[in-house]
């Protein structure tokens, strides 16, 4: 399976222009699957525009499905799950059919105020895997990657690959550790602990007063960065899933030795 990381700068609030950019990339890609960032069809810093744009973004997903021509496409969008209830979503398009993955952890610190606009997904119903080009994969959106449970659950559901659409802005954690260093450490940890390929696709460019740094990357199940996109500018690149590397990683991994009672303890704390 060949995967294209499409690190784009969305036009904030301009769904039609964003759709045209998505369509051009999908139509010119020679990959089996094209992955875009979080909320790539709308832009991230939407605030109250969220309630105006969801109808347009749902129509854009339908048009993108028509243009996908047998490819797998993962695009960031807004989904109305019932009247007036919106979710930060990834549209997963396979052979023209659309399904959705919903964000579980909605950040409310710093610049983030997602709970004001979105309802979180329900893991008991919304956690799912997909199959394409011989690979089983799952999707988790940005903040979900900062918690261990979604990746662990997807791996135990049989995922070979975890895709992470994100909208991560520039910030520093402490005096010297930049956010991109934190993300790289996090992605390597998910890959190593769960013996999966991990693909992170970040937004790039400015939206309102925020600047998104890009730096998308693909990490092997052995914790090696196999592909790294540019910082601070749009970029796109393709890599191939190495199934032999996946087999080697799983031979030396204990990720299936899952002790469910840990989660019962956590639920009671």
PLM features: residue spans?
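Extreme N-terminal starter segment of soluble prokaryotic enzymes
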Residues: 1-5
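Short polar catalytic/cofactor-binding loops
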Residues: 7-13
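Short amphipathic alpha-helices and their capping/turn segments at secondary-structure boundaries
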Residues: 20-31, 149-158
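Cys-nucleophile CN-hydrolase/nitrilase-fold catalytic domain and related Cys-dependent amidase chemistry
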Residues: 23-94, 99-104, 168-188, 192-196
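CN hydrolase (nitrilase-like) catalytic-core segments centered on the catalytic cysteine
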Residues: 57-75, 146-234
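Active-site catalytic loop in hydrolytic enzyme cores
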Residues: 57-59, 81-161, 165, 170-185, ...
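Short beta-strand scaffold segments in enzyme catalytic cores
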Residues: 75-77, 88-95, 128-130, 201, ...
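A conserved C-terminal secondary-structure "cap"
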Residues: 245-269
């Amino acid at each position: 399976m060949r995967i294209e990381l499409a690190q784009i700068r969305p036009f904030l609030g301009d769904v039609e222009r964003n759709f045209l950019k998505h369509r051009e990339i999908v139509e010119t890609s020679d990959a089996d699957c094209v992955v875009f960032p979080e909320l790539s069809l709308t832009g991230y810093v939407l605030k109250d525009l969220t309630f105006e744009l969801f109808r347009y973004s749902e129509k854009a997903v339908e048009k993108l499905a028509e243009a996908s021509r047998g490819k797998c496409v993962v695009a960031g969008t807004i989904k109305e799950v019932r009247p007036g209830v919106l979710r930060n979503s990834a549209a997963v398009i396979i052979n023209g059919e659309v399904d959705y993955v919903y964000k579980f952890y909605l950040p409310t610190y710093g610049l983030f105020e997602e709970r004001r606009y979105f309802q979180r997904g329900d893991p008991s119903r919304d956690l799912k895997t997909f199959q394409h080009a011989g690979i089983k994969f799952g999707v988790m959106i940005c903040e979900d990657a900062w918690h261990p449970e979604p990746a662990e659950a997807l791996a135990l559901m049989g995922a070979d690959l975890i895709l992470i659409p994100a909208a991560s802005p520039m910030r520093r954690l402490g005096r010297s550790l930049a956010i991109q260093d934190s993300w790289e450490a996090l992605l390597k940890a998910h890959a190593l602990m769960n013996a999966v390929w991990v693909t992170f696709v970040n937004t790039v460019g400015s939206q309102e007063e925020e600047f998104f740094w890009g730096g998308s990357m693909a990490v092997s199940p052995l914790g090696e960065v196999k592909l790294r996109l540019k910082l601070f500018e749009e970029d796109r690149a393709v890599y191939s899933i190495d199934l032999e590397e996946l087999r080697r990683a799983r031979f030396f991994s204990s990720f299936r030795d899952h002790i469910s009672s840990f989660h019962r303890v956590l639920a009671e704390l």
